[in-house]
């Protein structure tokens, strides 16, 4: 596998939009190219996102119902007056990758049997949708 003997490292990435008042922070743990876990914290303001508090509660309740039995996956949301904070963790050492694939929590070619998730490919994927790497976990704050 090549990951043996290597220490677990953390990479921090962020997608922040001051105008839309949304902030997504992801901490990626990996050992070599093998992904260990992803931990994301999203802060989104209702008004700027164009949704009400009740609408987002319904969306997240449906999401939670669909994914509640997925091993290695945890999710929570905290609702404030003007915004909500959503936390999602996927522990790839506990999860069944086939189930994550079926639930579209990870992407891989349908026919491919996967043994692990590549850190390099997931980082490239996040960067392709606008995430930027953050040094030492020093995230930009919403203003």
Please describe what each predicted stretch is:
Residues 7-143:
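Subset-of-secretome marker
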